[in-house]
Amino acid sequence: NNTANISDQYVHVITDVFDITIDRVSGNLVSSSLLQYDRELNGNEPLKLLSSTQNRLYVLESGLIGRDGPDNSRNGSAPVYSSAQTSYQMAESENQLEVDLSYTTDSGVNIVKRFTFNRDDYEIGVRYLIDNQSENEWQANFTGKIVRDQAGDQTSQNSMGIKAFLGLVVSTPEDPYEKYDFDDLRENPLNQSVTNGWLAFLQHYFLTAWVPEPDQQAQFQTTRRGPLAVMGFVYPATTVPAGNTVEVGASAYVGPKIIDRLETVAPNLDRTVDFGWLFFISLPLFIVLDWFHGIVGNWGVSIILLTVLVKGLFFHLSATSYRSMARMRAVAPKLARMKELYGDDRQRMSTEMMALYKREKINPLGGCLPILVQMPVFISLYWVLFESVQLRHAPFALWIHDLSVMDPYFILPIIMGASMMLQMHLNPTPPDPMQAKIMKLMPIVFTIFFLWFPAGLVLYWVVNNILSISQQWYITRKIEAQMAEKKH
C-alpha cells in the first residue's frame, strides 16, 4: 500500500529512554530525545541527539538501494511507508517494542521495515522483512547512513580549553579505532570493504553508531551531500527469489558513551570513551570511582573516597618524603650557618651541604616525589571527569551542582590555594632565595590555574592536600621531637 497519508508523515515512538520520530518517507530516524539526560543543568527539556530542523540536521538513514531497491532514486520517488499507528509507547509491563512500517512495490514485493526497541537500551534494531510475492527474482542492497551537518557540538562542556573529539570513528579488525574529523572526510573520503566493523559519529558524552551484522561484509563509504557529511555502509546485494522471504538489517546505537553498554553492542565500541594516553590508569580509576558511587550514591563523596584510597597507596612513599623534609627543616639552622661560612665558595658550600644531607639521611629531591608520582593519577582523573557522561550534571553538595565543570563561585580553588599555603609552612625554606620566592608564589599560581578546572578535580586536590598536611604535620612533629632528644 503506497497511498499512506503524507499529513501523518511521522511516527512517534516513546520508550523509557527514547522519544523518537521516524519519517514514513523512507523510514529514517529523524529525531531522538534522550529522556534520561537533560539538555541543561536543572532543565526540564531532554537532550536532543538526532534532529531535523531548519537550523540542524543530524539523522540516521537506512534503506534498500541497488537494482530493485525502493530507495534507489532511479526506481521512482522514495517509498512512503504505512504504519498501524502514528504513535507507539512502550508499556510499563513491556520489555520490548516493535514498530513495523509496511510498503508494497508495484511488482508485488511486500516490505516490512521493523524497528526494535528494548527497555533501558540505546541500541535499536533496524531490519527489513522482504516477502517477494512477484513473479521475478528481486534484488537490493541494504544501506545504513549517519547524515550530519558540520555544526559544532551542542552537548560539549568546554573544560580548560580542551574540546572533545567531534567526528567519525571507524573500526575494522585491522584498525580497531580510526578517527576522522570533518576536514579528513573532505580531503580523504572513505571507501573500504569491512567485515566485523562499525562506524560511529562522536561528540562529547554521546554518539550514534551503525553496527552491521557479525560476519557480514559491508562497504564503508563517506560522501558529501551539499553541506552535509554522509557516513555509512552498503551490504552486497540481497537476492530474494520469487515466492521467498528474506530478512536483512543492522543495529544502530543512539545514546550516551557508557563503557558497560557499548561493550555489549560491538567489540571496541567502548573505546569511544576516550580516557587519553593514560587510559591504563584512567580506566581502573573510573572502575573504582563507579564502584564507590554504587555504594554511596554521590559522585563527590566517591571522589573523596578515591582520594583517600590513592593517598593510602602512596602512604609509605609520602612518609619517606615527609621524613626527609622534616629533617631538612630541622637542619635549617646548620644550612644557614654554612651559608655564612662558605657563601662565596659555591663548590665548598655544595660539598658541605651534600655531606650534611648524607649524615642526616636527607633526600633533597624528596619533597617533589609525592607530587611527581601523583601527577599521572591527577591527569588520568581529569580525563575520567572530562569523558564520563555519568559525571555530567553530577551534583556534590551545597553550591557544587555539576562536578564536571568549574566551581561557579571559585570557592574550592581558593580552599585549595589556602591548603597549599599551609603545606608550604610545613616545608623547609629553600636555602636559595630565588627558590624560596618561587615556592611562595606556587599556591597563587596553582589557585589561578585551578579556577577553571572541573570542580571534581579541584575536590580531589583539596582532599589530597588536607590528607597530606595531616600526615606531614604528624611526621614533622615526630622528627623534631626525635632530634630534640638527640641534642639532650
Which residue ranges define each predicted feature?
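Helix-loop-helix
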Residues: 22, 128-129, 140-162, 226-228, ...
